[in-house]
Amino acid sequence: MQLMDLRKQGIDIQENIPLSRFTFTKTGGPAQYLAFPKNLNELELLVDTVKENNIPLTVIGNASNLIIRDGGISGLVLILTKMDTIVANKDEATVTADAGARIIDTSEAACEAGLSGLEFAAGIPGSVGGAVFMNAGAYGGETEFVIKSVRVLTRAGEFKTYTHDEMEFGYRHSLVQETGDIVVSATFGLEPGDKWAIKAKMEYFNGLRRAKQPLEYPSCGSVFKRPAGHFVGPMIIKAGLQGKRIGGAEDSMKHAGFIVNVGGATATDYLDLIHLIQKTIKKDFGIDLQTEVRIIGKEKD
């Protein structure tokens, strides 16, 4: 079966779509093919079809901590945001969420059920799949602290469930970065708590985020991993790069660890500024800054 034949089965597949429509930076080149599976059956059909036809496959979530190069992505890009069911089980103190569900919404569902543990995620704009993939965290919380199990679809087309320990979580790392498995859902193991205390903690974290982060501009969130014993923002400030602009990409005056799109930025602008910061920090401090943001796609011809 050819990929475009799946349209006849009601699967939403589009061609040559600018991915800048979906990324939080508002940058990125086109996807050769773009699909939005609505359920596991559609996802499985898409994965089987690209495997059968040797078509490259890229999976993205909410595209919040992601830079897609200006040349775009060859093959099929899957965006899983239509797979967004969230089920809270108060008796078992768990929340199970599809990969395309927003982690913010998952945190709110836990709160409504009086379950504590996901408060840290109240302002993280990514998807559940992305949070698992990156082991997203904030304000002392990490995804790995609350993961009970993760269900995936392997590139071979088989469904599999990993336990917490099998996920090999590390700082902004998980097993699926190595295997290429597609996260389809995650179950979070939480603790019973007072709904209003949980909500107050979430609102406190959101207040910190609004005060410290440049939410008024498009951005990809935190750009760099934190090196042991150092903070990225102060190093960038000491290096004289806060406020530095290349094209429409600017190192934020509100938080130097963020790069914002102040108007008309391209992915190349972002990457050129990232490389300048890395080069300068290496020269001034002897530290190799690693990117936290996921960078994919091809350069523009």
UniProtKB/Swiss-Prot annotation:
GO terms for biological process: cell division; cell wall organization; peptidoglycan biosynthetic process; regulation of cell shape. Keywords: Cell cycle, Cell division, Cell shape, Cell wall biogenesis/degradation, Cytoplasm, FAD, Flavoprotein, NADP, Oxidoreductase, Peptidoglycan synthesis. InterPro entries: FAD-bd_PCMH (IPR016166), FAD-bd_PCMH-like_sf (IPR036318), FAD-bd_PCMH_sub1 (IPR016167), FAD-bd_PCMH_sub2 (IPR016169), MurB (IPR003170), MurB_C (IPR011601), MurB_C_sf (IPR036635), Oxid_FAD_bind_N (IPR006094). GO terms for molecular function: FAD binding; UDP-N-acetylmuramate dehydrogenase activity. Its main location: cytoplasm. SUPFAM superfamilies: FAD-binding/transporter-associated domain-like, Uridine diphospho-N-Acetylenolpyruvylglucosamine reductase, MurB, C-terminal domain. Pathway: Cell wall biogenesis; peptidoglycan biosynthesis. It catalyses: UDP-N-acetyl-alpha-D-muramate + NADP(+) = UDP-N-acetyl-3-O-(1-carboxyvinyl)-alpha-D-glucosamine + NADPH + H(+). It is found in: Cytoplasm. Its cofactor is FAD. Pfam families: FAD_binding_4, MurB_C. Its EC number is 1.3.1.98. Residues 26-193 form the FAD-binding PCMH-type domain. GO terms for cellular component: cytosol. The active site is at R172, S222 (proton donor), E292. Cell wall formation. Belongs to the MurB family. NCBIfam families: murB, PRK13905.1. This is UDP-N-acetylenolpyruvoylglucosamine reductase. It comes from Lactobacillus johnsonii (strain CNCM I-12250 / La1 / NCC 533).
